[in-house]
Each structure stands twice: as C-alpha cells, then as structure tokens.
Amino acid sequence: MSLKLGVIGAGAIGKEHIRRCTQVLQGATVVAVSDINADNARAAVALPGVQAEVYADGHDVINASDVDAILVTSWDPTHEEYTLAAIAAGKPVFCEKPLAMTAEGCRRIVDAEMKAGRRLVQVGFMRPYDEGYLALKKVIDDGDIGAPLMLRCAHRNQSVGENYTTDMAITNTLIHELDVLRWLLNDDYRSVQVRFPRSTSHTHARLKDPQIVSFETKKGTLIDVEVFVNCQYGYDIQCEVVGETGIARLPEPSAVQMRKSASLSTAILTDWKDRFIKAYDVELQAFINDVKAGQLHGPSAWDGYAASVAADACIKAQGTSEPVEVTLPECPAFYKR
C-alpha cells in the first residue's frame, strides 16, 4: 500500500523531493502540496506523474485526512512550527535541516516527540546515506587506521548570493558537518573555535568568507573544517581522517579523467544536488520504508538538537577569538533504542 505524503514547501529542495518521490522512489505518493508562493506549489504538482492537491497552508496539509506522513521543506524559520504540528497530529515527519532555528527550538521538538511516546521525526541529514561516507565510517569502525586523531575537512560552494550572511556559514552550510562528523566518529564536541583568514574578494560586506572552524571532541580528536562558500571553482566536499596507523579520505565523486590539449583533468561538480543525489534517494526511501514498518531509524530529533547546540556554540565563537564550550546534555534513553 502506498504511503501518502504531504509536502510543505515547494521551492528548490521541496520540488526535487516531490520529483524524487514520484519518479524514482517506491511505495509513496505525494497527495498534498503547499507553499507560501502558490506558483511554486502549482509548478510542483505539474511535474510528470504528480497527482496532488494544492493547499494554501501547511497546517491544512498536516490535517488532511488522506495524508499519512509529512515532508517539511519550507523556509527554515517555519520548520519548528510544522514539525511540532505534525507530532501533535501523530504523523511521521521528515524535516529538512535545520530542525529549528535554535537549540531551544530543537529541544521543544525533542520534548514533544518523547511525550508522544514514539519516534515521529527524521531530520534531513543525507550524508550518513552517502556511499563515500559509509565507506569511510566502515574504515574507522573496523579499526583499519586505529583511533582517529585528527580530521581535516572542507565544505566549499562555488558562490552564494548577497542574502547569505556570516552566521549562515554555520546554520546552512557547516550544519551538515556538525551532524555527519558526530556520526562518523561516534563522538560529541567539547569545544569550538572560529578563525577568519584573509577574506576573498568575491564575498560581500555581510559575509566573512572563508572561515576555519576547529573542534575538539570529547574523546580528544581535533577537527578543522574550512567553510568557503565563494570558492568559484565548484562544489567540493573533503574529509581526511588521520588515524594512529594510517590516513583515510572521503572518496571523490566518480568522474571521467581526460587527457586533452596538453592537460590532465577531472571535472568537479558545481551543484550540491548532483553531489549527493543518490544519498537523497536512499535517505527518503529509508524514511518511506521505516514509516510503513512503524519504526524510524534515520537521523533523529536528538541529532538535530545536537547539531543545533554545536551550531549555537559556533556562532558564539564567531564573535570571539577564544574557544567556546559545546554543552550537550546526556542523550535520553528514548533515542538510544
């Protein structure tokens, strides 16, 4: 039986998820769509194969009798509101990152979900579903390079618009590393420090770019993440793990190597959707399967909360040259099942 999905938010990622659920994945049908811009919603339901009703409001989607589960892909500041409403309605909800705009907002979602008595929330962190990250985690978990001592990572975007500000390098960009590195290392952050090198000429007045974000984990691993969102040359994700007995690197995306015109070259992707397109597919298929099976297993509301606690510390660290403590409470037993 097909799982009936309601999608709140039909912008870039929402429209892509509607296409994905309709044309690529199995076991789900999009039956309801809303967006603050009605043209976005109408464009989404006009995609080949989509047969969904357009609603004026996200709450109407949540309360629709024919909707079994919710995808929240709306404007970031609305995520908490719609996720809480889905929990109150007893409907499983896949919420794109960030789960909420603050750690306090994420904690409200955690508390509401625990009060509901079962996991209803999956956060849209797709990197744990990426083949490269899964392979890298297996190397670490199997002890092939010994205990992880240091990580060197980079999150580079070709360019961003003038509405992108210094704090968004944390809340919209680094947020993925904040989640996936906890998962990769099975560890939490102890402290964070942010440094600003010489700024690129391709940035604007409200954005300091690049940034170097340095963490110490509770097990003592040191992590440096370069966030450079106007790198010009492409979309580039790097992760190198230095262990006691060896070094492991995140594999590069598969690409044809060319020898031409006295040069040796390999193309670099420019679109984040292309870099993790398979991971997005696997992530949403897992959500669909888990909802139908009655038990969610993907990134939880607690994972969203943990990433937000770290993000808040990073933003605080942007305003000082000193390390800032990352204070994450003990994970409740509810999320350790």
Curated annotation (Swiss-Prot):
NAD in keyword set: yes
Enzyme Commission code(s) on record: 1.1.1.18
Record carries keyword Oxidoreductase: yes
Reactions catalysed: myo-inositol + NAD(+) = scyllo-inosose + NADH + H(+)
Classification via Pfam families: GFO_IDH_MocA (PF01408), GFO_IDH_MocA_C (PF02894)
Enzyme class: oxidoreductase
Matches recorded under InterPro entries: Gfo-Idh-MocA_inositol_DH, Gfo/Idh/MocA-like_OxRdtase_C, Gfo/Idh/MocA-like_OxRdtase_N, MI/DCI_dehydrogenase, NAD(P)-bd_dom_sf
Keywords: NAD, Oxidoreductase
GO terms for MF: inositol 2-dehydrogenase (NAD+) activity; nucleotide binding
Top-level taxon: Bacteria
GO annotation, biological process: inositol catabolic process
Subunit structure: Homotetramer.
Function: Involved in the oxidation of myo-inositol (MI) to 2-keto-myo-inositol (2KMI or 2-inosose).
Family recorded in the similarity comment: Belongs to the Gfo/Idh/MocA family.
Name under which the protein is recorded: Inositol 2-dehydrogenase
Species in which this protein is naturally found: Klebsiella pneumoniae subsp. pneumoniae (strain ATCC 700721 / MGH 78578)
Taxonomic classification: Bacteria, Pseudomonadati, Pseudomonadota, Gammaproteobacteria, Enterobacterales
Gene: iolG
